[in-house]
Amino acid sequence: MDDQPRLMHSHPGVGMAGHPSLSQHMQDGTGANEGEGGRKQDIGDILQQIMTITDQSLDEAQARKHALNCHRMKPALFNVLCEIKEKTVLSIRGAQEEEPADPQLMRLDNMLLAEGVAGPEKGGGSAAAAAAAAASGGAGADNSAEHSDYRAKLSQIRQIYHTELEKYEQACNEFTTHVMNLLREQSRTRPISPKEIERMVSIIHRKFSSIQMQLKQSTCEAVMILRSRFLDARRKRRNFNKQATEILNEYFYSHLSNPYPSEEAKEELAKKCAITVSQVSNWFGNKRIRYKKNIGKFQEEANIYAAKTAVNATNVSVHGSQANSPSTPSSAGGYPSPCYQSDRRIQ
């Protein structure tokens, strides 16, 4: 018994530290610390690799992708990602709904169709001509040149619209195809369903629809400006026929000292010219302004109408004197003799 303490003191390296279970526990603690440090280092390496992905060349990226697809743990990683995705999708699945069509875009489409700009026919053919004829309210031969100009400019707007629309559709299709190919490629590594690809395509189309709306809006504005310039303005400044212009000018220059016709005179002139009273008033207002601005230019015209008025007055006086002159004696017996009554009055 006395030898045991002596043995323990004679071997200081053996004791509590020499207990096999305690020694194993201490070794496990050291291993755990080393394992935790190793995991931190692995995570740091992964993050560093992620940060340098954008700096990799295409060949390096393809090599990394091939190595990942051939890795023996790839199926396990994909299954874990599917489980995580399923939990996440369940919470947002009900929020995905199709949005209704934009009413503003529908209005623009209807307007472009009505104006003959949109539609299957390109080049401003019969549709544009029909729109021009309908907007003009019926054109005569006098306005054929103006309407031809309108149709030509409408055809130009139509051509620009379809050219820009083709560019828009081409860019949208190219970007959509690129995104779809990218998602299909990524679906080999992370779970992506076909419905999610369709949803992404619809999101892209909504983003591009804003560009389409701007194009259609600017086209509609161009058509409206063209319409007001060549059609509405033409109605306002429509020239009267030659006979109406002659009647109005004759009255104006015959009343040059006071070229302000009364309401009765306006109504009479409107009947003679087959126009409205307001058109007569507008014509006299514009005529007075033009005459005051350039009296010398209109003086010759005033002289012409003054001479014409004098000739007309002379003709009227001549015809009047002939109508009032006594009749010539007839061959039967000349003037009839007056009959005297008893009261000496001539019958």
Curated annotation (Swiss-Prot):
GO terms for molecular function: DNA-binding transcription factor activity, RNA polymerase II-specific; sequence-specific DNA binding. Its main location: nucleus. SMART domains: HOX (SM00389). It holds the Pfam family Homeobox_KN. Residues 233-295 bind DNA. GO terms for cellular component: nucleus; transcription regulator complex. Belongs to the TALE/PBX homeobox family. Acts as a transcriptional activator in complex with isoform 2 of meis1, to induce posterior neural and neural crest gene expression, and thereby specify hindbrain and neural crest cell fate. Binds to a highly conserved region in the promoter of the neural crest gene zic3. Required for the nuclear transport or retention of meis1. This is Pre-B-cell leukemia transcription factor 1.
